[in-house]
Amino acid sequence: MRATTAFQVIAFLAVGAAAAPTGLVQARAVDSLAVETDDIASSAGPRADDNGAASAGLKVKRQREYWCPNQVCAKTFATQEERDHHIANTVHPTNSKRDVLLQ
């Protein structure tokens, strides 16, 4: 078992060394505000304003669900207002035996 594990580790390291990049891009200083247009490191990768479909001009509708805090009810709502209305106007069953004992 140990020989197999050692062999696997050696093989993993050999493959990892072969796949490692040969040239590294020099990192800029953290407080550097200048961005050079011919610098590969500054022009590659995602930007802060890059949002996939949104940057392509498509409208992205964000969906968020709101849940009733009562675990027995567990209904979902599209808006916070619907959830608040449900909580204010619904008699909920108790969440647990502990809640029944405290009443």
Curated annotation (Swiss-Prot):
Keywords: Host nucleus, Metal-binding, Secreted, Signal, Transcription, Transcription regulation, Virulence, Zinc, Zinc-finger. InterPro entries: Znf_C2H2_type (IPR013087). A zinc finger (C2H2-type) spans 66-92. It comes from the Eukaryota. Residues 1-19 form the signal peptide. Induction: Expressed during multiple stages of host plant infection, including the prepenetration, early biotrophy, late biotrophy, transition and necrotrophy. Residues 82-103 are annotated as: Disordered. GO terms for cellular component: extracellular region; host cell nucleus. Its main location: secreted. Probable secreted effector that translocates into the nuclei of host cells to reprogram the expression of targeted genes by binding on effector binding elements in rice. This is Host transcription reprogramming factor 6. It comes from Pyricularia oryzae (strain 70-15 / ATCC MYA-4617 / FGSC 8958). The lineage of its organism: Eukaryota, Fungi, Dikarya, Ascomycota, Pezizomycotina.
